[in-house]
Protein backbone atom coordinates (compact mmCIF):
# COMPACT_ATOMS: atom_id res chain seq x y z
CA UNK A 1 0.00 0.00 0.00
CA UNK A 2 1.39 3.42 -0.97
CA UNK A 3 1.60 6.35 1.48
CA UNK A 4 -1.27 8.06 -0.33
CA UNK A 5 -3.40 4.93 -0.08
CA UNK A 6 -2.52 4.53 3.61
CA UNK A 7 -3.47 8.14 4.30
CA UNK A 8 -6.75 7.70 2.46
CA UNK A 9 -7.47 4.50 4.39
CA UNK A 10 -6.80 6.27 7.69
CA UNK A 11 -9.22 9.07 6.77
CA UNK A 12 -11.82 6.54 5.72
CA UNK A 13 -11.67 4.84 9.11
CA UNK A 14 -11.79 7.94 11.30
CA UNK A 15 -14.22 7.48 14.17
CA UNK A 16 -15.42 10.39 16.30
CA UNK A 17 -17.42 10.29 19.52
CA UNK A 18 -18.71 12.98 21.86
CA UNK A 19 -19.35 12.79 25.58
CA UNK A 20 -19.52 14.97 28.66
CA UNK A 21 -16.21 15.54 30.40
CA UNK A 22 -15.44 16.81 33.90
CA UNK A 23 -14.41 20.40 34.68
CA UNK A 24 -10.94 19.12 35.55
CA UNK A 25 -10.66 17.37 32.19
CA UNK A 26 -11.76 20.58 30.46
CA UNK A 27 -9.14 22.60 32.33
CA UNK A 28 -6.39 20.13 31.46
CA UNK A 29 -7.28 20.27 27.77
CA UNK A 30 -7.59 24.07 27.76
CA UNK A 31 -4.21 24.40 29.49
CA UNK A 32 -2.33 22.79 26.61
CA UNK A 33 -4.44 23.62 23.55
CA UNK A 34 -3.08 26.41 21.29
CA UNK A 35 -6.44 28.21 21.58
CA UNK A 36 -6.89 27.54 25.32
CA UNK A 37 -8.20 30.50 27.29
CA UNK A 38 -9.93 31.44 30.54
CA UNK A 39 -13.38 31.54 28.91
CA UNK A 40 -12.89 27.86 28.10
CA UNK A 41 -12.03 26.84 31.65
CA UNK A 42 -14.09 25.79 34.64
CA UNK A 43 -13.58 29.02 36.59
CA UNK A 44 -15.70 31.01 34.14
CA UNK A 45 -18.08 28.07 34.00
CA UNK A 46 -18.73 28.50 37.72
CA UNK A 47 -19.23 32.25 37.26
CA UNK A 48 -21.79 31.60 34.54
CA UNK A 49 -23.58 28.98 36.61
CA UNK A 50 -23.83 31.50 39.47
CA UNK A 51 -25.65 33.77 37.01
CA UNK A 52 -28.20 31.16 35.97
CA UNK A 53 -26.49 29.83 32.84
CA UNK A 54 -26.61 26.07 32.21
CA UNK A 55 -23.00 24.98 31.65
CA UNK A 56 -21.64 21.65 30.47
CA UNK A 57 -18.29 20.44 29.16
CA UNK A 58 -18.06 18.37 26.01
CA UNK A 59 -15.15 16.28 24.82
CA UNK A 60 -14.70 15.12 21.23
CA UNK A 61 -12.71 11.94 20.73
CA UNK A 62 -11.08 10.31 17.74
CA UNK A 63 -10.41 6.63 18.29
CA UNK A 64 -10.45 7.22 22.03
CA UNK A 65 -8.15 10.28 22.03
CA UNK A 66 -9.50 13.67 23.17
CA UNK A 67 -8.95 15.96 20.15
CA UNK A 68 -11.36 18.84 20.84
CA UNK A 69 -13.37 20.19 23.75
CA UNK A 70 -15.65 23.03 24.70
CA UNK A 71 -17.56 24.71 27.47
CA UNK A 72 -21.16 24.74 26.25
CA UNK A 73 -23.65 27.30 27.56
CA UNK A 74 -27.44 27.47 27.41
CA UNK A 75 -28.98 30.85 28.20
CA UNK A 76 -32.56 31.92 28.82
CA UNK A 77 -35.72 29.87 28.71
CA UNK A 78 -38.70 29.22 26.48
CA UNK A 79 -38.60 30.91 23.08
CA UNK A 80 -35.68 33.04 24.27
CA UNK A 81 -33.35 30.09 24.78
CA UNK A 82 -30.05 30.17 22.91
CA UNK A 83 -26.78 28.25 23.09
CA UNK A 84 -23.35 29.86 23.09
CA UNK A 85 -19.67 28.99 23.08
CA UNK A 86 -17.38 31.78 24.28
CA UNK A 87 -13.90 31.76 22.72
CA UNK A 88 -14.27 28.21 21.50
CA UNK A 89 -14.73 25.41 20.71
CA UNK A 90 -11.10 24.36 21.11
CA UNK A 91 -10.53 22.49 17.88
CA UNK A 92 -8.42 22.42 14.73
CA UNK A 93 -10.72 24.16 12.24
CA UNK A 94 -8.44 23.21 9.35
CA UNK A 95 -9.47 19.61 9.98
CA UNK A 96 -12.79 19.69 8.14
CA UNK A 97 -13.96 16.26 9.23
CA UNK A 98 -13.38 17.06 12.88
CA UNK A 99 -14.92 20.53 12.52
CA UNK A 100 -18.01 19.08 10.86
CA UNK A 101 -18.43 16.53 13.63
CA UNK A 102 -17.94 19.09 16.42
CA UNK A 103 -20.57 21.46 15.07
CA UNK A 104 -23.03 18.66 14.31
CA UNK A 105 -22.81 17.65 17.97
CA UNK A 106 -23.09 21.24 19.21
CA UNK A 107 -26.19 21.74 17.08
CA UNK A 108 -27.71 18.52 18.44
CA UNK A 109 -26.98 19.63 22.03
CA UNK A 110 -28.46 23.05 21.36
CA UNK A 111 -31.57 21.52 19.81
CA UNK A 112 -32.02 19.16 22.76
CA UNK A 113 -31.85 22.17 25.09
CA UNK A 114 -34.60 23.95 23.14
CA UNK A 115 -32.28 26.66 21.82
CA UNK A 116 -33.32 28.73 18.83
CA UNK A 117 -29.75 29.34 17.72
CA UNK A 118 -26.13 28.56 18.48
CA UNK A 119 -23.59 31.40 18.67
CA UNK A 120 -19.84 30.75 18.70
CA UNK A 121 -16.80 33.03 18.83
CA UNK A 122 -13.72 30.90 18.18
CA UNK A 123 -10.48 31.82 19.96
CA UNK A 124 -8.71 31.59 16.62
CA UNK A 125 -6.88 34.53 15.06
CA UNK A 126 -7.95 35.41 11.54
CA UNK A 127 -5.01 37.73 11.01
CA UNK A 128 -1.98 38.89 13.01
CA UNK A 129 -1.09 42.59 12.79
CA UNK A 130 1.61 44.89 14.07
CA UNK A 131 1.00 47.42 16.83
CA UNK A 132 -0.32 49.96 14.31
CA UNK A 133 -2.88 47.46 12.99
CA UNK A 134 -1.08 46.69 9.72
CA UNK A 135 -1.27 43.09 8.41
CA UNK A 136 1.93 41.08 8.67
CA UNK A 137 3.71 38.46 6.65
CA UNK A 138 6.07 35.92 8.21
CA UNK A 139 9.09 38.24 7.96
CA UNK A 140 7.21 41.25 9.34
CA UNK A 141 5.87 39.21 12.25
CA UNK A 142 9.37 38.66 13.59
CA UNK A 143 10.13 42.38 13.44
CA UNK A 144 6.80 43.25 15.11
CA UNK A 145 7.47 41.21 18.23
CA UNK A 146 5.15 38.34 17.31
CA UNK A 147 6.21 34.98 18.81
CA UNK A 148 7.85 32.47 16.50
CA UNK A 149 5.44 30.02 14.92
CA UNK A 150 2.37 32.26 15.11
CA UNK A 151 0.34 32.18 11.89
CA UNK A 152 -0.04 35.61 10.27
CA UNK A 153 -3.14 34.75 8.23
CA UNK A 154 -5.55 35.55 6.79
CA UNK A 155 -7.18 32.30 7.87
CA UNK A 156 -9.83 32.07 5.18
CA UNK A 157 -9.52 28.28 5.26
CA UNK A 158 -10.63 28.13 8.89
CA UNK A 159 -13.63 30.37 8.27
CA UNK A 160 -14.64 28.34 5.22
CA UNK A 161 -14.42 25.16 7.29
CA UNK A 162 -16.78 26.57 9.92
CA UNK A 163 -19.29 28.10 7.50
CA UNK A 164 -19.44 24.80 5.59
CA UNK A 165 -21.06 23.38 8.74
CA UNK A 166 -24.07 25.67 8.37
CA UNK A 167 -22.92 28.65 10.44
CA UNK A 168 -23.23 32.20 9.13
CA UNK A 169 -20.21 34.46 9.65
CA UNK A 170 -20.88 37.97 10.94
CA UNK A 171 -17.97 39.38 8.96
CA UNK A 172 -15.08 41.53 10.13
CA UNK A 173 -16.50 44.50 12.03
CA UNK A 174 -14.58 47.03 14.10
CA UNK A 175 -15.82 48.34 17.43
CA UNK A 176 -16.16 46.91 20.91
CA UNK A 177 -18.12 43.66 21.27
CA UNK A 178 -19.11 41.49 24.22
CA UNK A 179 -16.43 39.02 23.13
CA UNK A 180 -13.63 41.23 21.76
CA UNK A 181 -12.67 40.40 18.19
CA UNK A 182 -9.63 42.66 18.34
CA UNK A 183 -6.97 41.89 20.95
CA UNK A 184 -3.71 43.61 21.89
CA UNK A 185 -0.91 41.35 23.14
CA UNK A 186 2.72 41.44 24.19
CA UNK A 187 5.19 38.59 23.90
CA UNK A 188 7.49 38.50 26.93
CA UNK A 189 9.83 35.83 25.57
CA UNK A 190 13.46 36.75 26.15
CA UNK A 191 12.73 39.44 28.75
CA UNK A 192 14.61 38.13 31.77
CA UNK A 193 14.00 40.84 34.36
CA UNK A 194 12.40 44.17 35.22
CA UNK A 195 15.15 46.13 33.49
CA UNK A 196 14.69 44.30 30.19
CA UNK A 197 10.91 44.61 30.48
CA UNK A 198 11.09 48.37 30.99
CA UNK A 199 13.51 48.74 28.08
CA UNK A 200 10.97 47.06 25.76
CA UNK A 201 8.39 49.86 26.17
CA UNK A 202 7.99 53.07 24.21
CA UNK A 203 9.79 56.19 25.45
CA UNK A 204 6.67 57.72 27.03
CA UNK A 205 5.62 54.52 28.78
CA UNK A 206 9.11 54.04 30.21
CA UNK A 207 8.90 57.57 31.58
CA UNK A 208 5.45 56.96 33.06
CA UNK A 209 6.59 53.79 34.85
CA UNK A 210 9.46 55.75 36.38
CA UNK A 211 7.19 58.63 37.40
CA UNK A 212 4.88 56.22 39.21
CA UNK A 213 7.80 54.56 40.97
CA UNK A 214 9.40 57.89 41.91
CA UNK A 215 6.18 59.27 43.38
CA UNK A 216 5.31 56.59 45.89
CA UNK A 217 2.89 54.50 43.82
CA UNK A 218 2.65 50.94 45.13
CA UNK A 219 0.66 48.03 43.66
CA UNK A 220 -1.06 45.59 45.97
CA UNK A 221 -3.26 42.55 45.42
CA UNK A 222 -6.50 43.03 47.33
CA UNK A 223 -8.78 40.56 49.08
CA UNK A 224 -12.48 39.86 48.80
CA UNK A 225 -13.36 42.38 51.51
CA UNK A 226 -11.91 45.17 49.34
CA UNK A 227 -13.85 44.44 46.15
CA UNK A 228 -16.17 47.35 46.92
CA UNK A 229 -13.16 49.63 46.51
CA UNK A 230 -12.27 47.89 43.25
CA UNK A 231 -15.82 48.42 41.98
CA UNK A 232 -15.81 52.10 42.92
CA UNK A 233 -12.57 52.78 41.05
CA UNK A 234 -13.93 50.99 37.97
CA UNK A 235 -17.10 53.07 38.26
CA UNK A 236 -15.08 56.27 37.80
CA UNK A 237 -13.82 55.11 34.41
CA UNK A 238 -17.19 53.70 33.36
CA UNK A 239 -18.86 57.06 34.00
CA UNK A 240 -16.21 58.84 31.94
CA UNK A 241 -16.30 56.39 29.01
CA UNK A 242 -20.03 55.70 28.98
CA UNK A 243 -19.74 51.99 29.85
CA UNK A 244 -21.88 50.13 32.37
CA UNK A 245 -19.93 48.84 35.34
CA UNK A 246 -20.33 45.33 36.72
CA UNK A 247 -21.93 45.08 40.19
CA UNK A 248 -19.80 44.21 43.20
CA UNK A 249 -21.54 40.83 43.33
CA UNK A 250 -20.10 39.94 39.91
CA UNK A 251 -16.56 40.63 41.06
CA UNK A 252 -17.28 38.56 44.17
CA UNK A 253 -18.42 35.69 41.95
CA UNK A 254 -15.18 35.87 39.96
CA UNK A 255 -13.15 35.98 43.17
CA UNK A 256 -14.99 32.97 44.62
CA UNK A 257 -15.15 30.91 41.42
CA UNK A 258 -11.61 31.45 40.16
CA UNK A 259 -9.59 31.55 43.34
CA UNK A 260 -5.93 32.35 42.75
CA UNK A 261 -6.52 32.61 38.99
CA UNK A 262 -8.30 35.94 39.55
CA UNK A 263 -5.93 38.71 40.62
CA UNK A 264 -7.50 41.99 41.72
CA UNK A 265 -4.87 44.73 41.98
CA UNK A 266 -5.08 48.31 43.23
CA UNK A 267 -2.35 50.92 42.80
CA UNK A 268 -2.17 53.22 45.82
CA UNK A 269 -0.29 56.45 46.39
CA UNK A 270 1.67 56.01 49.61
CA UNK A 271 1.30 59.60 50.75
CA UNK A 272 4.01 59.43 53.43
CA UNK A 273 6.45 57.99 50.90
CA UNK A 274 5.38 60.56 48.31
CA UNK A 275 6.01 63.40 50.78
CA UNK A 276 9.38 61.99 51.82
CA UNK A 277 10.48 61.71 48.18
CA UNK A 278 9.71 65.35 47.47
CA UNK A 279 11.14 66.60 50.75
CA UNK A 280 14.39 64.83 49.87
CA UNK A 281 14.39 66.44 46.41
CA UNK A 282 13.61 69.85 47.92
CA UNK A 283 16.51 69.55 50.34
CA UNK A 284 18.87 68.39 47.59
CA UNK A 285 17.97 71.37 45.41
CA UNK A 286 18.41 73.71 48.38
CA UNK A 287 21.89 72.27 48.98
CA UNK A 288 22.75 72.72 45.30
CA UNK A 289 21.63 76.35 45.46
CA UNK A 290 23.85 76.99 48.47
CA UNK A 291 26.86 75.44 46.72
CA UNK A 292 26.29 77.40 43.52
CA UNK A 293 25.80 80.66 45.39
CA UNK A 294 29.10 80.08 47.20
CA UNK A 295 30.92 79.17 43.99
CA UNK A 296 29.60 82.33 42.36
CA UNK A 297 31.85 84.39 44.62
CA UNK A 298 35.01 83.01 42.99
CA UNK A 299 33.71 81.81 39.61
CA UNK A 300 35.78 82.62 36.51
CA UNK A 301 32.66 82.38 34.35
CA UNK A 302 29.87 83.67 36.61
CA UNK A 303 27.37 83.74 33.75
CA UNK A 304 27.52 79.91 33.53
CA UNK A 305 27.01 79.58 37.26
CA UNK A 306 24.09 82.02 37.08
CA UNK A 307 22.43 79.88 34.41
CA UNK A 308 22.86 76.74 36.52
CA UNK A 309 21.60 78.60 39.56
CA UNK A 310 18.49 79.81 37.74
CA UNK A 311 17.74 76.25 36.62
CA UNK A 312 18.16 74.77 40.11
CA UNK A 313 16.06 77.53 41.67
CA UNK A 314 13.22 76.68 39.29
CA UNK A 315 13.50 73.03 40.28
CA UNK A 316 13.58 73.98 43.95
CA UNK A 317 10.44 76.10 43.58
CA UNK A 318 8.71 73.22 41.80
CA UNK A 319 9.75 70.86 44.60
CA UNK A 320 8.36 73.28 47.18
CA UNK A 321 5.01 73.22 45.38
CA UNK A 322 5.08 69.42 45.22
CA UNK A 323 5.80 69.22 48.95
CA UNK A 324 2.85 71.50 49.62
CA UNK A 325 0.60 69.31 47.46
CA UNK A 326 1.97 66.18 49.13
CA UNK A 327 0.89 67.51 52.52
CA UNK A 328 -2.63 67.93 51.11
CA UNK A 329 -2.60 64.34 49.87
CA UNK A 330 -1.77 63.21 53.40
CA UNK A 331 -5.07 64.69 54.59
CA UNK A 332 -6.90 62.40 52.12
CA UNK A 333 -5.38 59.25 53.60
CA UNK A 334 -2.24 57.23 54.12
CA UNK A 335 -2.85 55.23 50.94
CA UNK A 336 -4.93 56.82 48.16
CA UNK A 337 -6.39 54.34 45.63
CA UNK A 338 -5.58 55.69 42.18
CA UNK A 339 -6.17 52.77 39.79
CA UNK A 340 -7.41 49.17 39.79
CA UNK A 341 -7.33 46.21 37.41
CA UNK A 342 -8.43 42.58 37.30
CA UNK A 343 -6.18 39.96 35.72
CA UNK A 344 -7.10 36.36 34.94
CA UNK A 345 -4.35 33.77 34.89
CA UNK A 346 -4.54 30.83 32.49
CA UNK A 347 -1.69 28.36 31.83
CA UNK A 348 -1.36 29.86 28.35
CA UNK A 349 -1.58 33.57 29.20
CA UNK A 350 -2.40 36.36 31.61
CA UNK A 351 -5.43 38.46 30.63
CA UNK A 352 -6.10 42.08 31.61
CA UNK A 353 -9.88 42.02 31.94
CA UNK A 354 -11.37 44.98 33.88
CA UNK A 355 -9.90 48.25 35.10
CA UNK A 356 -10.55 51.75 36.31
CA UNK A 357 -8.68 54.81 37.50
CA UNK A 358 -9.25 58.07 39.34
CA UNK A 359 -8.55 60.96 36.95
CA UNK A 360 -7.74 63.16 39.97
CA UNK A 361 -4.43 61.33 40.22
CA UNK A 362 -3.77 60.80 36.50
CA UNK A 363 -0.26 62.31 36.68
CA UNK A 364 0.83 59.50 38.99
CA UNK A 365 0.38 56.98 36.12
CA UNK A 366 -0.93 54.35 38.52
CA UNK A 367 -2.61 52.35 35.73
CA UNK A 368 0.74 52.06 33.95
CA UNK A 369 2.35 50.91 37.19
CA UNK A 370 -0.18 48.07 37.50
CA UNK A 371 0.51 46.80 33.98
CA UNK A 372 4.26 46.88 34.55
CA UNK A 373 3.87 45.12 37.89
CA UNK A 374 1.82 42.25 36.45
CA UNK A 375 4.04 41.81 33.41
CA UNK A 376 6.93 41.49 35.83
CA UNK A 377 4.93 38.83 37.64
CA UNK A 378 4.43 37.04 34.30
CA UNK A 379 8.18 36.90 33.78
CA UNK A 380 8.67 35.47 37.27
CA UNK A 381 6.03 32.80 36.62
CA UNK A 382 7.28 31.95 33.14
CA UNK A 383 4.05 33.12 31.46
CA UNK A 384 5.22 34.67 28.19
CA UNK A 385 1.88 35.71 26.66
CA UNK A 386 0.40 38.91 28.09
CA UNK A 387 -3.08 39.68 26.79
CA UNK A 388 -4.22 43.31 27.09
CA UNK A 389 -7.53 42.02 25.73
CA UNK A 390 -9.98 44.22 23.87
CA UNK A 391 -9.37 47.14 21.52
CA UNK A 392 -11.89 48.34 18.94
CA UNK A 393 -9.83 47.75 15.80
CA UNK A 394 -9.79 51.40 14.69
CA UNK A 395 -6.19 52.47 14.05
CA UNK A 396 -6.48 55.34 11.55
CA UNK A 397 -8.71 57.85 13.36
CA UNK A 398 -7.02 60.00 16.04
CA UNK A 399 -10.45 61.25 17.14
CA UNK A 400 -11.94 57.80 17.69
CA UNK A 401 -13.38 57.33 21.22
CA UNK A 402 -11.17 54.27 21.71
CA UNK A 403 -7.97 56.08 20.77
CA UNK A 404 -6.80 56.73 24.31
CA UNK A 405 -7.10 53.08 25.32
CA UNK A 406 -5.36 51.96 22.13
CA UNK A 407 -2.43 54.34 22.65
CA UNK A 408 -2.14 53.28 26.30
CA UNK A 409 -1.73 49.64 25.23
CA UNK A 410 0.48 50.49 22.25
CA UNK A 411 2.92 52.16 24.65
CA UNK A 412 3.90 48.71 25.91
CA UNK A 413 4.99 47.74 22.37
CA UNK A 414 2.97 44.66 21.50
CA UNK A 415 1.05 43.34 18.52
CA UNK A 416 -2.56 42.75 17.46
CA UNK A 417 -4.62 39.62 16.92
CA UNK A 418 -7.75 40.00 14.84
CA UNK A 419 -9.94 37.02 15.69
CA UNK A 420 -12.43 35.31 13.39
CA UNK A 421 -15.44 36.86 15.11
CA UNK A 422 -19.03 35.74 15.56
CA UNK A 423 -20.70 32.77 13.87
CA UNK A 424 -24.35 31.85 14.25
CA UNK A 425 -26.29 28.70 13.39
CA UNK A 426 -30.09 28.44 13.44
CA UNK A 427 -31.21 25.43 15.47
CA UNK A 428 -34.98 25.54 15.21
CA UNK A 429 -37.15 27.45 12.73
CA UNK A 430 -38.37 30.91 13.72
CA UNK A 431 -41.94 30.84 15.00
Predicted regions and their residues:
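Short secondary-structure transition/capping segments
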Residues: 130-132, 182-183, 232-234, 398-400, ...
Amino acid sequence: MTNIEASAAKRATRTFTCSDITPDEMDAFSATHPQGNFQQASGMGRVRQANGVAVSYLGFYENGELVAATQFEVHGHGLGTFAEVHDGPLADFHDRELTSYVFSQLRARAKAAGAAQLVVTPEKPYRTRNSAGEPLDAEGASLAGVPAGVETGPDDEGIASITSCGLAHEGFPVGYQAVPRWRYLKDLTGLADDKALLASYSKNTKRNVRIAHDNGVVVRRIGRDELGLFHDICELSCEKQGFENKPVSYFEQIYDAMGDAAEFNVAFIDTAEHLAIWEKKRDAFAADIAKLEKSLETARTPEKVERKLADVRKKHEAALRRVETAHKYETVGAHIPAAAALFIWHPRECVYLFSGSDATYAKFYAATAIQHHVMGECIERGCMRYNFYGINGVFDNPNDPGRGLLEFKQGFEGYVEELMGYFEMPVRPAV
